[in-house]
Design a protein with these regions (language model features):
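Short alpha-helical interface patches
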Residues: 4-7, 110-115, 191, 205, ...
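Secretory targeting and sorting signals
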Residues: 1-35
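Functionally critical loop-and-helix segments that line ligand-binding/catalytic clefts
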Residues: 37-105, 242-296
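Catalytic domains of cell-wall/extracellular-matrix polysaccharide-remodeling enzymes
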Residues: 182-264
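Flexible, glycine-rich phosphate/dinucleotide-binding loops
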Residues: 130, 159, 235, 258, ...
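Substrate-binding cleft of extracellular glycoside hydrolase catalytic domains
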Residues: 84, 89-213, 219-221
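Short acidic, gly/pro-rich beta-turn/loop elements at beta-sheet edges
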Residues: 109, 162, 238, 261, ...
């Protein structure tokens, strides 16, 4: 996306009088209008909608597109139960409920989700080096003020710029980390290419190098290793490297269990177990271990 186009989109977004492309999830969202800088024509609003649809992809959107969502009320209930992995037999005795959001949720009613037992959230901050979530401040700061342990995530497009460039952009636009006990390390969202070839036209070795570039740059800038979000099917098709010794795994699988994990991870830290009515997650441990992840 050109600089002029990005500037035009930013100006249009700042002038919106209603949330754009927000999902109306009953009590889970608020349709609170931001103060209008100037009225927009229908043509301008449509241009913003088109741009968001072309340049903004929520976490798991491409996994759901390719792999489907087989979650049911029964599988969602099962996801809330401890599921110790072979690497940690009988050691996981608790879980913590969480969620992740993007611009599609608009202004989120954090009190509602808190009352439903959610205690952590990651919100989308960036995609590539051209997109920032226009609702990021409300989602990131609003959840924090409600009491959530919160973090930010970056939707990767490995064919558009280097891992270092995208990590730098992410940190500069909300993806940093602070040792306040309530901020999670940033998450790197690695999933199917929404624009074309599954692995973005990269070999497994090249994709591994790209992820390492992001992973190392993020660590250099924040002192934390990023959480890696992915599905086992995508990872095993596109990546050959091993990040299990540094990066906590956030696995996506919309079924009754997290299933087989990506290469060499012995257990998952977070499991995204459904995308309905929005992305919901479970932390694999007790609340004090979630706090430990935030504290580093």
């Amino acid at each position: 996306m050109s600089t002029s186009r990005r500037g035009r989109r930013t100006a249009l977004l700042s002038a919106l009088t209603v949330p754009v492309v927000a999902l109306l999830l009953g009590a889970s969202t608020e349709a609170t209008a931001a103060p209008a800088a100037s009225p927009l024509s229908a043509r301008e609003i449509n241009a913003v909608n088109t741009d968001i649809q072309a340049n903004n992809h929520a976490m798991g959107s491409q996994i759901r597109r390719v792999e489907g969502d087989q979650s049911t009320p029964e599988t969602k209930a099962a996801a809330q139960q401890p599921q110790p992995a072979a690497a940690l037999p009988n050691q996981v005795a608790a879980t913590v409920a969480g969620m992740d959001v993007a611009s599609y949720q608009g202004n989120v009613n954090w009190g509602n989700w808190w009352s439903q037992g959610k205690r952590f959230v990651w919100t989308k901050a960036t995609e590539s080096t051209s997109y920032t979530n226009p609702y990021f401040a409300q989602q990131y700061n609003g959840s924090y003020n409600q009491g959530f342990i919160r973090g930010a995530y970056h939707f990767a497009t490995p064919n558009t710029s280097s891992g270092a460039a995208q990590a730098t952009y992410f940190v500069a636009h909300g993806g940093g980390w602070s040792a306040d006990g309530k901020t999670l390390p940033g998450a790197l969202d690695m999933e199917y290419n929404p624009y074309g070839a599954t692995c973005y036209g990269l070999s497994k070795a090249s994709m591994t190098a790209w992820i390492k570039d992001f992973h190392d740059t993020y660590h250099a800038k924040t002192g934390r290793w990023p959480v890696i979000y992915t599905s086992t099917n995508w990872w095993n098709q596109c990546v050959s490297g091993d990040f299990s010794s540094t990066a906590p795994l956030w696995v996506a699988r919309y079924a009754s269990s997290a299933g087989t994990l990506p290469y060499n991870w012995g257990y998952y830290t977070v499991w995204q177990y459904t995308s309905s009515p929005l992305d919901q997650d479970t932390f694999n441990g007790a609340y004090d271990r979630l706090q430990a992840l935030a504290n580093g």
